[in-house]
Amino acid sequence: MNYEDVMKLALERGFYFPSCEVYGDAHAGFWEYGPTGVSIKNKFLELWRRQLVRRDRMLEIDGSQIMSKSVFEASGHLGNFADPIVKCKKCKSTFRADKLIADTSEIEIPESADLKEFDQVIREKAISCSKCNGELDEVKKFNMMFKVWIGPEEEEAYLRPETCQSIFVDFPRLFKTMRGKLPIGIAQVGKSFRNEIAPRQSLLRLREFYQAEIEVFCNPTKLDDLEKFSEV
């Protein structure tokens, strides 16, 4: 069974399907689970909780999806959570520069590389727009954070790109109120949001998606004392 067969079966049986599909302006990268899909997702989460969270006596939280600007300034997301993009001067189509280069020249450039490196390869390999063959502009960085405005004062905030942020900022309170001691594991299941340049392959690269995440806090000077640490 290939990818197209899986997609056809999923849509026919209502496992999952595009969000807002009855309207012509629906955006890519947003999918919804039907009844069967929800059942499968819930079974996975129950297994995850049973085999990891409850077995190792971890704490589970449910943090906010919208968080303050300060959180992401401290984490570095506002400055570094970005992908290299390049736009066609003719048809204005936008592409991920690293993927376009890999698809057309089979040259792999890490997305963290300097922008000048992308521009150089595009010029040397005479890479053009894959849609209209037009000339490409200079490569730029595109931040994938979803910005939102809070209240009538329009205070700047962001949808979280990962579930770990709540775990980190809530750790001091959790450690105190739960009378924790190191090592301690904190888990969270919830939605994250990334303004992907080119969401694709249905559930594999989304702009809104679920994450099940665990962070383990420990004393770095006592790693050898941790049970099963050598198995990680």
Spans of model-derived segments:
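TRNA-recognition modules of translation machinery and tRNA-sensing kinases, especially anticodon-binding
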Residues: 2-232
